[in-house]
């Protein structure tokens, strides 16, 4: 990041409206990773570049803790919003505070570009851009997910989002033929995130894994300590494995593999004595 961009961000106080947009500061570049480099001075890693430039409608990211998934998705969302007028991007997470982090990142990047912006429909965690596109966060419940029509649905910490909330999100992108981006660290071999990650029959998904080995700044001493003290947790948080929770006697994935869904049910009425 250049000194000028740093100073611009340091002087920003998250005002409701920033100075007028300066066109040359925000060039229209169709390739997101190139735009991030030129407009934001954001240098993506090879894995982040893959995420930014993926054009698919279905994207699922299996990421280590502190890998930077929120930041890279904020960059990707802002690029989509700036380059596609009048689209809505909805962000949901297990807590509204977590979803708000993505919005905060978006606002930070918009401030770097001196983009005029305001809240969308007076929502607390939102940003509306001059071209009419909006990015907003919603709470983790089916009631608030229903009724939104969006072009991109972003689900952060998707491994801990409840199934009924997932079910409520899908209609929001049906009319627009919208995109669905899921990002999370695993949380056991259960739930929609686990199912979508493993079931290739669920459509054309781009699946990207980013372990701690893709994090250049990871503290090796901390990794070794957690690996020795909490090996299962280290496998999950750092190496993106769907680990069985400690203390559980039966592995649901194992049960699923041994169940034969082709067996027809027994007609018990045949064996009942007639009066």
Language model features by range: what are they?
Residues 1-58, 268, 273:
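Pre-P-loop entry segment of helicase/translocase ATPase cores
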Residues 56-76:
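Walker A/P-loop
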Residues 58-60, 88-90, 152, 179:
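Residue-level preference for the first positions of well-ordered beta-strands
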Residues 66, 94, 185:
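Conserved H-loop
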Residues 80-100:
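Conserved SF1/SF2 helicase motif Ia
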Residues 100-151:
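Inter-Walker segment of RecA-like/P-loop motor cores
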Residues 108-110, 152, 160-233:
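ASCE P-loop NTPase helicase motor core
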Residues 212-275:
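ATPase catalytic-site recognition across NTP-hydrolyzing enzymes
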């Amino acid at each position: 990041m250049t000194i000028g961009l740093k100073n611009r961000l340091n002087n920003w106080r998250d005002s409701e409206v920033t100075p007028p947009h300066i066109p040359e500061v925000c060039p229209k570049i169709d390739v997101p990773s190139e735009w991030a480099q030129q407009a934001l001075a954001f240098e993506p890693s090879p894995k982040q570049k893959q995420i930014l430039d993926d054009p698919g409608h279905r994207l699922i990211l299996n990421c280590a803790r502190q890998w930077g998934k929120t930041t890279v998705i904020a960059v990707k969302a802002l690029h989509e919003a700036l380059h596609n007028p009048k689209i809505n991007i909805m962000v949901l997470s297990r807590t509204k505070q977590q979803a708000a982090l993505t919005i905060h990142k978006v606002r930070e990047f918009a401030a770097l570009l001196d983009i005029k912006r305001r809240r969308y429909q007076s929502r607390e965690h939102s940003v509306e851009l001059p071209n009419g596109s909006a990015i907003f966060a919603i709470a983790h419940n089916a009631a608030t997910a229903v009724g939104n029509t969006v072009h991109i649905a972003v689900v952060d910490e998707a491994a801990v989002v409840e199934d009924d909330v997932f079910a409520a999100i899908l209609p929001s992108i049906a009319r627009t033929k919208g995109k669905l981006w899921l990002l999370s660290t695993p949380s056991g071999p259960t739930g929609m995130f686990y199912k979508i990650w493993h079931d290739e029959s669920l459509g054309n998904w781009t699946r990207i894994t980013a372990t701690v080995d893709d994090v250049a700044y990871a503290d090796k001493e901390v990794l070794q300590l957690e690996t020795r003290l909490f090996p299962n947790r280290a496998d999950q948080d750092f190496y993106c494995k769907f680990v069985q929770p400690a203390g559980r006697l039966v592995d649901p994935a194992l049960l699923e593999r041994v169940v034969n869904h082709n067996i027809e049910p027994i007609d018990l009425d045949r064996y009942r004595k007639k009066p």
